[in-house]
Amino acid sequence: MCRAISLRRLLLLLLQLSQLLAVTQGKTLVLGKEGESAELPCESSQKKITVFTWKFSDQRKILGQHGKGVLIRGGSPSQFDRFDSKKGAWEKGSFPLIINKLKMEDSQTYICELENRKEEVELWVFKVTFSPGTSLLQGQSLTLTLDSNSKVSNPLTECKHKKGKVVSGSKVLSMSNLRVQDSDFWNCTVTLDQKKNWFGMTLSVLGFQSTAITAYKSEGESAEFSFPLNFAEENGWGELMWKAEKDSFFQPWISFSIKNKEVSVQKSTKDLKLQLKETLPLTLKIPQVSLQFAGSGNLTLTLDKGTLHQEVNLVVMKVAQLNNTLTCEVMGPTSPKMRLTLKQENQEARVSEEQKVVQVVAPETGLWQCLLSEGDKVKMDSRIQVLSRGVNQTVFLACVLGGSFGFLGFLGLCILCCVRCRHQQRQAARMSQIKRLLSEKKTCQCPHRMQKSHNLI
């Protein structure tokens, strides 16, 4: 019983395989895209005008030529107005069938009869759908689906951008995380049994003109970030979340809204004193950067069409001389290939390492330069004037002595003012007592009274 069932399944599988092979064996295959035109070939060995007829597989006549070079259609014009032939090619022995405005139901076998023989041509019409469409936001994905006759299996679909990017698949082709640079015309090819058909796709990706922005600044300088869009937008809202290199989490820096192309700040971190331009394109300025601000951020812009994201990076350099050591430090997202170099100007490098901090002990007097570079390209540089150690000590001693003398002078002035003020207070008290005694008329000519008054004065 089991053997009989297995045998039936095997026979059924062989029958299906033979039917599939029969579709293409001895036939010419032509591919066509829905809505476009297809040319089905039919060639004569005599290379001259001869009698020919094109038919459907059910023997219904489509068109033909039975002498005198006149094209005869097999039905009413309304039924066969999409079918035609190239009269100019007849004299060369070519009698193609042209089918315009292809439909999915046109996928079938067509028969060309000429010179007492028949030629079968298999037409496979496919339809291309784009989901969600050919106009998308940056970061979204596009799915290209190829619908075709159920007999068609595993075609190769390949789309190529003019800049060289290639995406390939079979009946389903996916393009994920699209960028603005992916916009423009794509040339696509469908290949089946070594037969090819071409179609074009114009893709429009809406978003920020740059996928990432990195600013390289020395400590104390201002940094400005601009976020231009490749399309006109009037309304939306957004925010910038920032993660400093020393922090382990993101925190909000600024939030804003866009209304009628005007930008308004909703909330901002006070410590940074961020400045946001009131008109598009979005432009953010940090008046004065420092090492503690170095890090990465994510700008989010929410529109009616969807949400856009923009990566923002800030790299900050600081060069300082402390005691007898010259230090150059960089913070922020840098490539592992970047190199930090510390040298005297117009001289060979003293220190050059793939690190974020370099130092020189007992640096020579003169102008020093710190450079952050990647390969031959210098990303940023900063300069500092180094003074000799003796000069530094003299300046320090002068500052200390000057401060000491200044303090002593100030202290003496305070004491003098206090003594003078105390003396004036005592004198005022004595005068007040004399006036009181005089007003009471207790004065007399007695010697002891005169002596008392004199002592009070």
Swiss-Prot record:
| Domain Ig-like C2-type residue range list | 129-207, 208-317, 318-374
* Known tissue expression: Highly expressed in T-helper cells. The presence of CD4 is a hallmark of T-helper cells which are specialized in the activation and growth of cytotoxic T-cells, regulation of B cells, or activation of phagocytes. CD4 is also present in other immune cells such as macrophages, dendritic cells or NK cells.
Can you state the subunit structure given in the record?
A: Forms disulfide-linked homodimers at the cell surface. Interacts with LCK. Interacts with PTK2/FAK1. Binds to P4HB/PDI. Interacts with IL16; this interaction induces a CD4-dependent signaling in lymphocytes. Interacts (via Ig-like V-type domain) with MHCII alpha chain (via alpha-2 domain) and beta chain (via beta-2 domain); this interaction increases the affinity of TCR for peptide-MHCII. CD4 oligomerization via Ig-like C2-type 2 and 3 domains appears to be required for stable binding to MHCII and adhesion between T cells and APCs.
Q: How does it sit in the membrane?
A: Single-pass type I membrane protein
Query: Any coiled-coil ranges, and where?
Result: none
Q: Which UniProt keywords apply?
A: Adaptive immunity, Cell membrane, Disulfide bond, Glycoprotein, Immunity, Immunoglobulin domain, Lipoprotein, Membrane, Palmitate, Phosphoprotein, Repeat, Signal, Transmembrane, Transmembrane helix
What highest taxon heads this organism's lineage? Eukaryota
Lipid attachment of type S-palmitoyl cysteine occurs at which residues? C418, C421
Keyword Nuclease attached: no
- Main localization of the protein described in the UniProt heading: membrane
Ranges in the topological domain labelled Cytoplasmic: 418-457
Q: Which organism is it from?
A: Mus musculus
Protein name per its UniProtKB record: T-cell surface glycoprotein CD4
Provide the transmembrane region boundaries: 395-417
Sites of glycosylation? Answer: N187, N298, N323, N392
- Gene Ontology CC annotation, any one: endoplasmic reticulum membrane
